[in-house]
């Protein structure tokens, strides 16, 4: 993963990987048939770690009804911070998911290790049926892939690693531009109407 971060997904060679690992290229070929197989195994390794976040998480579905945005945030923050804590894995994962062969690979792979996360999503679908109207590929590209992309920008130093960045990314992912295209006058009106309800 460190080699992909340094040389890019297409530019990395088995020789680069073996040098960083401190082994001969031949030693890698004893375990992997090709660079592509090694990349897929690395992806699966990191993907399973990301799925493990949700396996350990305490999730109370009732929170969706009382504070849906906080329920989403309680799932999103650990996922985002997972990527911030792993710079090499984050850059690798983003580049692998962004590659031309990923969509076909993604449709054919076994991702059953995400079953707990899928169960959480189904609870959201039941509470908010309008989520089913969204193209699911587009929804997950927006939420999960964009989260990894923003984390990549943070670990590469393009965005600052601070609370303001985290809050802004979450707000942008959940509200989009419409959350920012409100004048102060409209914002005050909304606040007043909420307070009178």
Regions found by a protein language model. Give the residues of each.
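Hydrophobic alpha-helical connector segments
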Residues: 41, 55-85, 139-143
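Helix-turn-helix
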Residues: 3-37, 41
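Amphipathic alpha-helical packing segments from all-alpha helical-bundle domains
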Residues: 51-56, 88, 101-128, 137-141, ...
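Alpha-helical DNA-contacting segments of helix-turn-helix folds
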Residues: 39-46, 93
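Short, basic, alpha-helical segments at the C-terminal edge of helix-turn-helix-like DNA-binding modules
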Residues: 14, 44-51
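Short, structured helix-loop boundary elements
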Residues: 14, 36, 40, 65-69, ...
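Amphipathic alpha-helical segments used for helix-helix packing
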Residues: 82-103, 152-156
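Hydrophobic/aromatic-rich alpha-helical bundle segments in the mid-to-C-terminal region
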Residues: 103, 126-172, 182-197
């Amino acid at each position: 993963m460190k080699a992909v971060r340094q040389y890019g997904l297409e530019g990395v060679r088995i020789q680069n990987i073996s040098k960083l690992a401190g082994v001969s290229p031949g030693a890698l070929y004893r375990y992997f048939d090709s660079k592509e197989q090694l990349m897929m195994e690395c992806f699966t390794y990191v993907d399973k770690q990301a799925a493990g976040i949700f396996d350990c998480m305490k999730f109370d579905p009732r929170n969706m009804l009382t504070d849906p945005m906080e329920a989403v945030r309680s799932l999103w923050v650990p996922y985002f911070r997972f990527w911030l804590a792993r710079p090499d894995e984050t850059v690798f994962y983003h580049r692998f998911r962004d590659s031309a062969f990923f969509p076909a690979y993604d449709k054919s792979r076994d991702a059953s290790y995400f079953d707990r996360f899928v169960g959480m999503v189904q609870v959201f679908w039941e509470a908010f049926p309008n989520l089913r109207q969204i193209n699911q590929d587009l929804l997950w590209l927006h939420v999960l892939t964009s989260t990894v992309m923003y984390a990549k920008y943070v670990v590469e130093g393009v965005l600052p690693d601070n609370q303001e960045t985290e809050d802004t990314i979450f707000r942008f992912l959940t509200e989009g531009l419409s959350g920012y295209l409100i004048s102060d006058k409209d914002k005050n009106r909304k606040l007043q109407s909420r307070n009178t309800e």
